[in-house]
Design a protein with these regions (language model features):
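Glycine- and Gly-Pro-enriched alpha-helical subdomains that act as flexible
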Residues: 132-152
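Conserved alpha/beta cores of soluble small-molecule-handling proteins
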Residues: 1-132
Length: 152
């Protein structure tokens, strides 16, 4: 995670990468990153860095851009995958309407939520806004089942 402080300091995307270095849905991630950069008023360079990464196991690759640091490509293994997790819910952080929903540089609320979840003996903090599950501290909630199961 970035140490930048404001939402307009950085734009990023995180994608699944397999053991062959192939990025899942690479073009879609780059399109979303361009859209988010525009919403955040971050001017991206014309060319993107190579998304080819050398990995020995399936994991995540994070592509980020900041004016101060330029492009960065980071790989990390999955910390949890296909297993049952315990969660707490916390109020979702809010910014201005253009910033809400963007992958940006203000990580403080996410870090604080992760620490809060760990102190409660949980694996993840789920962000709720107006009675809806909108995000999580370290992954994107994909589905909320009727029985309360959240798929991240």
């Amino acid at each position: 995670m970035s140490q930048t402080s404001g939402p307009r300091d950085e734009v990023f995307t995180t994608a699944v990468v397999n053991s062959k270095g192939q990025i899942a849905d690479g073009p879609a991630h780059l399109m979303r990153m361009k859209d988010h950069a525009k919403r955040l008023r971050i001017s991206l360079p014309e060319t993107f860095p190579s998304m080819d990464v050398e990995v020995s196991e399936m994991g995540l690759v994070r592509l980020s851009y900041s004016v101060e640091q330029g492009w960065r490509v980071q790989h990390r293994p999955f910390t949890v995958r296909n297993e049952s997790l315990d969660a707490i819910s916390v109020p979702a952080p809010r910014w201005n309407p253009k910033t809400n929903g963007c992958k940006h540089g203000d990580w403080a609320p996410y870090n604080e939520a992760r620490v809060r979840a760990e102190k409660a003996g949980c694996d993840v903090a789920l962000f709720v806004h107006e009675h809806a599950l909108v995000d999580a501290d370290r992954g994107t909630p994909m589905l909320l089942d009727e029985d309360g199961t959240v798929w991240i």
